Amino acid sequence: MAAARPTVSIYSKDGSVSSETIALPFVFKAPIRPDLVRSVHTAVAKNKRQPYAVSEKAGHQTSAESWGTGRALARIPRVGGGGTHRSGQAAFGNMCRSGRMFAPTKTWRKWHVKVNQNEKRYAISSAVAASGVPSLLLARGHRIEEIPEVPLVVDDAVQSFQKTKEAVALLKEIKAYRDVVKVANSRKLRAGKGKLRNRRHVQRRGPLVVFNEDAGIVKAFRNIPGVEIVNVRRLNLLQLAPGGHLGRFVIWTKSAFGLLDSVFGSTTEAAQLKKNYFLPENIISNADVTRLINSDEIQSIVKAAGPSRVKRAHVQKKNPLKNKAVLARLNPYAKAYKANVKLNTGKTPKAAGEKFLTVLHEN
């Protein structure tokens, strides 16, 4: 796995590897949590929505009155007049043709969703760590088979690019242009009403270029299909994990890659650009729980599996206060306790009276 390498090579703008290397930032060793990334992405993506609602007049722009009872018809308001199909038809109700909807939507709906700050930072850390795992990038559909290594770091001279042809030449030299071709070929007409709302086409996502300082790099890369550009101080989960799926192909500039330790810190040192923030760490070092359970160290102290027990389908409930056998099974001392209570009451047995003895010995 590429994220386990202690250092990362730096590639020049002509695609050749330079002699200098850079240490792998601590954020690439953060726990990868797909569940957390998915939930945070779902919440954060809702904050870009534009409020919408139906017209307050919709379904009520007609004159209609109820005909009352006695006509063997529903009491719903009906359009008056005659000489047209519309006269006599029901109006206003949500069950009526041309009526309003039930509970018309309002613009003051609660559109935004609050997310815990530490939760968002955890999700972004996981997304950055996942961008250094080649198998996750391939599973997401990125064409990185010919990429020299992941994470991919290029020289800071790229930040000074002014022309798109320079950016395209760089992508071709580092074998990343296949991902751009994939995006260009994926452009399709959107299904549904979105075609009418200025989002006529859909296409896949390509590489994400992360820079430290903009000396022209934004203008150079912004017109390439599928390529997105972001400052390392403004890393966004919507770009690092589009659709809530981990494994975005990221191209880092050298200075941006070196700044990651200042942005995210480590598990022991706080981040410089995030107040009192420490990187999360795994509770267990090996996430393969099945392998741990089946290891010799744990199996040597675990009791052997006993015979299988079949639970009785139905057990009749018996009252131990009335059933002596059940009481004895629940509390074996109950019988001795009851006998002891009788002995310790201190009462002497009452002698039989003369009248009883006379009747007893009667011939």
From Swiss-Prot:
Function: Component of the ribosome, a large ribonucleoprotein complex responsible for the synthesis of proteins in the cell. The small ribosomal subunit (SSU) binds messenger RNAs (mRNAs) and translates the encoded message by selecting cognate aminoacyl-transfer RNA (tRNA) molecules. The large subunit (LSU) contains the ribosomal catalytic site termed the peptidyl transferase center (PTC), which catalyzes the formation of peptide bonds, thereby polymerizing the amino acids delivered by tRNAs into a polypeptide chain.
Species annotation: Schizosaccharomyces pombe (strain 972 / ATCC 24843) (Fission yeast)
PANTHER family documented for this protein: 60S RIBOSOMAL PROTEIN L4
Gene Ontology MF terms in the entry: RNA binding; structural constituent of ribosome
Keywords: Cytoplasm, Nucleus, Phosphoprotein, Ribonucleoprotein, Ribosomal protein
Protein name: Large ribosomal subunit protein uL4A
Family that this chain belongs to: Belongs to the universal ribosomal protein uL4 family.
Assembly notes: Component of the large ribosomal subunit (LSU). Mature yeast ribosomes consist of a small (40S) and a large (60S) subunit. The 40S small subunit contains 1 molecule of ribosomal RNA (18S rRNA) and at least 33 different proteins. The large 60S subunit contains 3 rRNA molecules (25S, 5.8S and 5S rRNA) and at least 46 different proteins. uL4 is associated with the polypeptide exit tunnel. uL4 interacts with its chaperone ACL4 and the nuclear import receptor KAP104.
